[in-house]
Amino acid sequence: MSIITKEFKIKAKGLKFPEGPICMNDGSIILVEIARGTLSKINTLGETEVIADLGGGPNGAAIGPDGYCYVCNNGGFEWEVAQNDKFMRPILESKSYSGGKIQKVNIVTGEFSTLYDNCNNTPLNGPNDIVFDKSGNFWFTDLGKVRKRNMDRGAIYWAKADGSMIKEVIQPFMTPNGIGLSPDERSLYVAETEGGKLY
């Protein structure tokens, strides 16, 4: 049995719980920093700059067909920090939590708006990850929030990118996290955090 090894290169350091990386055509990487509350960009020199200070807990991100970045904002966490500030993990809903939302960000100017914060008057609790379909609309997971003695049951949504329609497609779903579409878009894939499963 042979072991394949590849060299890895560190592109940036000091990021505050990065997720949702997007490789851009110019070689830069756009990602969210959940603990920092930002949508950030790492240029080809490895320098990090803030595109937008979104607040809460920006989680997953995807570039839409209009060139805007669509961000799942989970509303924020309380954090446990260990190993001399070298390791941090989310543990509970933030004390300043005011709800989850889908945000639309102009990656050139940093201007942003809230596209959705509810579905038929049911609040979004903790939007987590997002994927666009060929029609230019998107699917996203809502993992929910964890509190000291209870946690939400999550859901999967489909929404129009122009802000005109959102549908709850599957609920309940325990801790839906990553989401993706097959190339022919006949299959939707969802990762479940708590159970360690892929559906």
Residue ranges of predicted features:
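Sequence-structural signature of mature extracellular/luminal beta-sheet repeat domains
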Residues: 1-199
